[in-house]
Structures are given as structure tokens and as C-alpha cells.
Amino acid sequence: MAINNIIVVGCNIVGLYSALRCADNGYRVSIVDKLSSDKISRKNRNNYRVFNKSHHIYIHLLNRFSIKYEKYLLKYNEKTLNVLASIINKSKLIPKKSLNTQSFVKFCRSILSIADYNILKNNLEAYEHIYSNLSAMDALAMLSSDISATQEYYILTDDIGVLIDRMTVYLKTKNVEFYYNTEIRDITQSNNITYSSTRTNTFISNILILAISKDNLLKFNLLTKDQRKLLNNVSKYNIDCESIYTDKHLKNEYDIKTHLLDKLHIVCPIKKHSLYLWNYGINNIIIRDKIKHMFSHIFICGDAYSRSNFFINYSFETFDNIYSKIIHRMAHPY
């Protein structure tokens, strides 16, 4: 029976970041993952390569571990930009509740001429495939900030695996313990102590951080019906993000510097075949806050529940938003 202050479930980059923040504060931390070390190291090696100047958490992490990146130039289609600018301006006159209860596709059909709508449809890749599942409010927030033509973009020249490896080495110097091939099958909580059980062992901790997917979260019997309802406010879409949502030339590792996009792509180089999106018709700000306070000593920070699943910066932000609560719980465990 292993006893630790904090257990992190999930040895992905979000789990590593969570462990990093906790270890830097002097807490005793262990990371548990059901995969082997080799499988984890082979996973997501080409992910999260493009980011913009507003992604401060990610940039700070890259700088801390001396990860190399450079400016990345994007060339946007002027007609598309003009249509998007028109949509954004018109949306300012629409109540937020209305924007939140309809898909972006439906909203655009209601305010655009047929000609302008076709420009958008033809220049946003897989437009109706994804934007019919994204609320107008969420889409407008992303289009006016994260993938805006006015943003300054960067691209990693180092493999993301370099960051993961350096974080792992650093965590080991902080005496963080790694338990691979270890699947948490059951979670119970009693007297503000959390028990995380595997097939052969039980981890006891003051704090449990779950940096795992929605599918894996819902396997735990700990969750009540209402809690499951909260977690089901995101839906999984089987989308080949690598082929639809990325700059396809990013696959050519050494042909990046000279490439200019001639369409407005969602700049999201993630090698996933599925993506979680917030359901429209709900206020995900309120839902995220409820998930944050779902338990007293268990915290959920998987990227499915971040503000936006398209960029890793927001997954880190999800953890940062619960970090002060973790510190408080560690100082006042009972």
C-alpha cells in the first residue's frame, strides 16, 4: 500500500504538467498510468506544434525547458477574412444566450448571403463537419482570438517529445514516482482521504488529480448520476484531426519554414482521431466551474474539459484554475 500526498492519474503532458506544479511546491507526488513507458513515449510525438503569442502558459513551459520554436507565418484568404470579420461584427448585436444555443453553421446561415456563406464553406476546411457541432459562441471566440489573422504564431522546431522527456527527467529529480502498467480500477473517498485501487494495490492520497479522458473517467463507480450528467456536457466526435484540422505540410518535418497556408485552417496539429467538443445550448463556463468543485479532494483536468480542446495551453489552464484549491486542501486537509 503506497502512501503519497498527491496522486496524478495520466502520464500525458497534462498529467506531467500537473505533477510539475505540485512537485515544485514541495508536495510528494506519484504519477500512475495504465500504459507502459514505451507506449507513452511513442504517443503524441508530433502534437501541439503550433501555438500563438497569447498562449502564455505553454510558452513559459517551453522556455523553462529550453524547447526551441520559431515564428510561423500564415497566409490567409482575404475573402474569407472579410466574411469572418462581418460575422464577428454582427454577432456583437446578438444576445449571448442566442449565440450559445445554436450551432455556428446555423448562425451563419441566418446572417450571411448565399455568396458569403459559400465563401466560408469553401475556405474553412470540413466546415459543416465540425462547425455544426460547435456553438456559435465558442466558434466566434476561437475565430476572433486563437486562429485570428492578427495573431502572431510560433511553431516548435524541437519535437514535443523533447519537452516530455525533459519534464520527466526533471520530475524524477524531484523524487516523483512513476507507476507504469498500472490501471486505477476503483476510487473511493473517506474522511478526506482518497483510495485509488489497482488490481493488486491501493494508493492512499490527500489529493487525486485525474488527467484522463471522459471515457476513462466515466468508468469509475465513484460518480453519481448528476456528476455523470455534468461530465456528459462534452461529446466525442470521431474526426481525423491529423488530416482535417492541421496544416497538412506539418507532416513533412523538414519542409515547414517555407510553407504558407492559402486557406484559413484551424491551426491545430494534434494527432488524434477523435475530439471532445462542448455541447451547444449549455454554458460551459458554469459547467467547468461545477466540475472544478465536484469533489473536495479529487480534481479533473483532462483536456476534454478545457476551455478549448484545440490548443494544449487551455488544458494547462484547466489545471492552473484548480491549483489554488489544491494548495488550500493540502494546507487544510480536513
For each feature predicted by the language model, list its residue ranges:
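A short, Lys/Arg-enriched amphipathic alpha-helix followed by its capping loop at the start of a domain
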Residues: 17-27, 64, 174
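Beta1/beta-strand and adjacent pyrophosphate-binding region of the FAD-binding site
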Residues: 2-14
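Glycine-rich FAD pyrophosphate-binding loop
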Residues: 23-43
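Dinucleotide-binding Rossmann-like beta1-alpha1 core, especially the glycine-rich loop
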Residues: 44-98
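Conserved Rossmann-like nucleotide-cofactor binding loop
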Residues: 14, 37, 215
